Amino acid sequence: MAAGCALLALPVRKRPGAMLEMLNRAEAADRYRLALGHAHPDWGNGSLGSVAMSLPRSAEPFLNDPDYVDCMLTVFAALKTRNDRRVALTRLRN
């Protein structure tokens, strides 16, 4: 939900890139956490939520807000795409 609210605070045209940047920051923060044993100072513990909480966010609207639904669909699509790529890479390696 925090990622959707972070996207909602941005102009529509910036949302896809911002979503990818949040995912990249979460992965970087997770690597930092694993290497150093503590959370990244800016991006948190490696979760998407901790990255999103570090950004300006709109207040969470009701789920019948079409703009918020679009933001959540952007979040889910990015997560699904990233997962699908990981599954495909795993299959190629086996």
Question: Which residues make up each language-model segment?
Answer:
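Short alpha-helix boundary/capping elements
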Residues: V12, L23-L34, S47, K80
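Short glycine-rich, low-complexity/disordered patches
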Residues: G17-M22, Y32-A39, R85-R93
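Charged, low-complexity interaction regions
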Residues: L8-G17, R31-A35, A59-P66
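Amphipathic alpha-helical binding modules
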Residues: M53-N94
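Charged/polar low-complexity intrinsically disordered segments, enriched in acidic residues
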Residues: L36, H40-P61
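Short terminal alpha-helical segments
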Residues: M1-A26
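Acidic, Ser/Pro/Thr-rich low-complexity regulatory regions
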Residues: M1, E21-L23, A35, H40, ...
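Compositionally biased non-globular segments, especially hydrophobic aliphatic-rich helices
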Residues: C5-A9, A29, D42, A77, ...
